[in-house]
């Protein structure tokens, strides 16, 4: 099995690569072009929606273009998200986080387009999920990994399961489901 660590490998990132989605996209694209005729499993993790909250400029202003404060979304600003923060600063930090989500969404779209370009959409199961959400003082706390509130665990799970490999039963549900059951089922498809 070929594997590689993307995003957190300093040798691949270079010195000034704050936004990892372009690098991830390029490396995944190269891998898919080399391997698209073989059966494959690929796990792609877009890291950009993790701290710092500093999306590229066009996304930084997307949800809060009138902000005049000093918060830029860097770690020092993130550390100041605590009770007592000014409402406009908190709104701006949430807007930066949302900007990062929108930025990564663009790269998920590029992955979809690449799968389509390589004629893989009709025989590839594609699962899009978030590893966690983020709490922004909804319960007087910030970050993730410390509670089980909806802000942290109510995350997207989108499954593209094409007709070519779909079994006899097919349904859509908005109920909670178990990854313990979903992953073995999908890997047998």
Residue ranges and their predicted role:
Residues 1-189:
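Catalytic domains that recognize anionic headgroups
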């Amino acid at each position: 099995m070929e594997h590689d660590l993307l995003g957190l490998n300093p040798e691949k990132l270079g010195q000034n690569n704050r936004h990892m989605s372009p690098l991830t996209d390029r490396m995944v694209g190269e891998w898919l072009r080399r391997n698209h005729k073989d059966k494959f499993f690929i796990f792609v993790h877009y890291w950009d929606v993790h701290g710092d909250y500093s999306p590229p400029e066009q996304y930084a202003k997307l949800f809060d273009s009138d902000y005049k404060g000093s918060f830029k979304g860097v770690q020092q600003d993130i550390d100041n998200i605590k009770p007592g923060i000014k409402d406009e600063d908190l709104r701006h930090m949430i807007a930066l986080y949302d900007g990062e989500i929108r930025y990564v969404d663009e790269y998920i779209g590029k992955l979809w387009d690449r799968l389509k370009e390589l004629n893989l959409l009709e025989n590839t199961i594609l699962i899009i999920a978030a590893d966690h959400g983020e709490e922004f003082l909804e319960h007087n706390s910030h970050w993730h990994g410390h509670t089980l509130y909806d802000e942290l665990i109510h995350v997207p799970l989108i499954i593209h399961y094409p007709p070519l490999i779909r079994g006899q039963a097919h349904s859509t549900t908005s109920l909670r489901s178990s990854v313990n059951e979903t992953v073995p089922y999908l890997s047998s498809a």
